[in-house]
Amino acid sequence: MNWLEKGPVKVAILDLYEGKANQGMRCIRTILHDWAGSNDLELQVTEYDVRLRNELPDTSYDIYISSGGPGDPLISRFDDWDIAWGRWLDKMTRWNQNPSTTRKKYIFFICHSFQLACRYFNAGLVCKRKSTAFGVFPIHMLEAGKDEPV
């Protein structure tokens, strides 16, 4: 995608931190600001409080970033926010699978969101860790992802 084709790049940040103190949201904002600056892009960024306010974006954005957050994705399956997040992901998936859609929607899932997405797509078994962990864990690309532009 040529980001310069159509004015500002619209970015939706889905905040799953549930109002808890974190470094994730600050880092996401910084990375976006730096990326826009180094590519001479104008950004329109909107943040959505998914867990406390049940806020979710529509399909008008170019990029979606769904954050990490506290808690256990194994036990939130029946929480209102988790159900709404799954419906949002279903809407985004249907958008991208529609053959008449010319501009696909790109979603970056971070930590907690990545686990929710794995659960949604049945892409792996989400299970408890052996111990508390922080940092980067390896992920492996699925065969279908090798042809994706992002």
Task: Kindly give the residue locations of the regions a language model identified.
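Short secondary-structure capping/junction motifs at helix and strand boundaries
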Residues: 42, 100-105, 126-127, 148
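Short, flexible active-site-adjacent loop segments at beta-strand->alpha-helix junctions, enriched
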Residues: 70, 113-114, 145
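Catalytic nucleophile loop
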Residues: 96-121
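Pocket-forming structural segment of enzyme catalytic cores
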Residues: 122-150
